[in-house]
Amino acid sequence: NETIIDDWQGFSNIEEENTAAAIAVLGYMHQWERAHLFFGVRNVNEDFFTSDVTSLFFNGSCGIFPTIAASYPIANYPLSGLTVYFDVSKGGFTFRNSLYNGVGYNGWSKHDNPFLVRPKKDGIFNMSQLEFSYSGGNYFAGAAVHTRHYGVDPDGNQCEPDQSTKKASCAWWVYGEQKVWQAADKEIACMAQYSENSNRDNGCYRYAELGVA
């Protein structure tokens, strides 16, 4: 018998192997009335691309837009890294920003653990996003900058961190979700997303998606 996919987890875009005792989030967060500040181990999946409709399409093994996930070996599932994160909200607006070590890790060895900070070798990675919620809709615009370039081979595989070069690049994105129908506990929402990376030699430099959920 032929099957569509080898593993049930594949239907949820979960393709990574099991990792024992890997740290996803570990740190200290201080909370004010309209703001949060966090320092410690964290990954991008905690704070970005987690809105209601988008989370149905992402947050598995890809986790975030491919213009970022396929371009940099960052703290994206199943990897994490040392992070300084904050967000501020007022009215329907929220601004959030995260500063990470340029490479994510999930091991427990001396040279592979999420507590490493090596800006000269791994680079620095920063993500910023502005969000607006109004009348059943959520709208987002953001940008990410990495201080090192990770090329790809002819097979599309990303180079190792030791082979990266000192060349900054950025990715930007806009996306929105809007409820178009609601009755009792059921609703339908439409989604549109677009993103580009400034370096066309990265794993993915342009991405777009339309969806209904």
Protein language model annotation of sequence segments:
Residues 37-39, 86, 95-97, 139-143, ...:
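Membrane-embedded beta-strand positions of outer-membrane beta-barrel proteins
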Residues 33-34, 89-92, 133-139, 181-188:
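Short loop/turn motifs that connect adjacent beta-strands in outer-membrane beta-barrel proteins
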Residues 103-175:
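Surface-exposed beta-loop-beta
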Residues 166-167, 196-207:
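Solvent-exposed loop/turn segments connecting transmembrane beta-strands
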Residues 171, 175-195:
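Surface-exposed extracellular loop regions of Gram-negative outer-membrane beta-barrel proteins
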